[in-house]
From Swiss-Prot:
Its EC number is 2.1.1.-. Specifically dimethylates two adjacent adenosines in the loop of a conserved hairpin near the 3'-end of 16S rRNA in the 30S particle. May play a critical role in biogenesis of 30S subunits. CDD domains: AdoMet_MTases (cd02440). PANTHER family: DIMETHYLADENOSINE TRANSFERASE, DIMETHYLADENOSINE TRANSFERASE-RELATED. This is Probable ribosomal RNA small subunit methyltransferase A. Belongs to the class I-like SAM-binding methyltransferase superfamily. rRNA adenine N(6)-methyltransferase family. RsmA subfamily. The lineage of its organism: Archaea, Methanobacteriati, Methanobacteriota, Thermococci, Thermococcales. S-adenosyl-L-methionine binds at residues 23, 25, 50, 71, 95, 110. It is found in: Cytoplasm.
Amino acid sequence: MRDRLFFLLSKYGIRPNDRIGQHFLIVKDVIDKAIEVAEVSKSDVVLEVGPGLGFLTDELSKRAKKVFTIELDRRIIEILRNEYSWNNVEIIQGDAVKVEWPSFNKVVSNIPYQISSPFTFKLLKMEFERAVVMYQLEFALRMTAKPGDRNYSRLSLMTQALADVEIVMRIGKGAFYPKPKVDSALVLITPKKDRIELNESLVKALFQHRRKVVSKALRESAHMLGIKDVKTVKDILSSVPHSNKRVFHLTPEEVKEIEEYLREHRIIS
């Protein structure tokens, strides 16, 4: 796979573009693991973001009914169209965060790491069965962190309100060319049957002061909720559920209780 990569790069005179996060996956075992965990079968329509030189895409095409792959770099698209004769792969040119996604039921992707947050939040708004995504290890640890953990953040809370997330494989820098500066991880994302839809402005306001207790965090971030004079709602904010709990200990269910209380008192809509 490494030899094939260098051959294609040389043939087309391409140098990986670090500005758009081009780090090509070159270890077959990692590709096989991603497809195995995603449980890709002939009935599946798979979305891939960032096909690279087509190594993962090619394996997906052999196992799935249909593959949609989104790529920003026109040079890469030229290679894919010239080098492969897939009849069940559709290449979409564009920015994966901005373009409209087709319907799919599974995701298998080695995404550019700089789009990790917007990609993930866009994905979690979609209907799908499971996703296996390559992330920077640090990002994956934040996604999967539990309440009270050092890495527990707005990302952790918002992700786990909507899905079960699990690191299934840690991957070293040597699995990519060129080598990234960070280690990576494959993450399995499975949407929850009972998703908890949270007010994003409230979550942002709370996690602006993640180490403070809830009542104080809300007072100090009141402007983010459209509160012009915090004195007028001081008693309401002091009586909020879990008022004395530190923000980074809150579960999605507890944030939902806070949201419903604030909505009941017309602090948020």
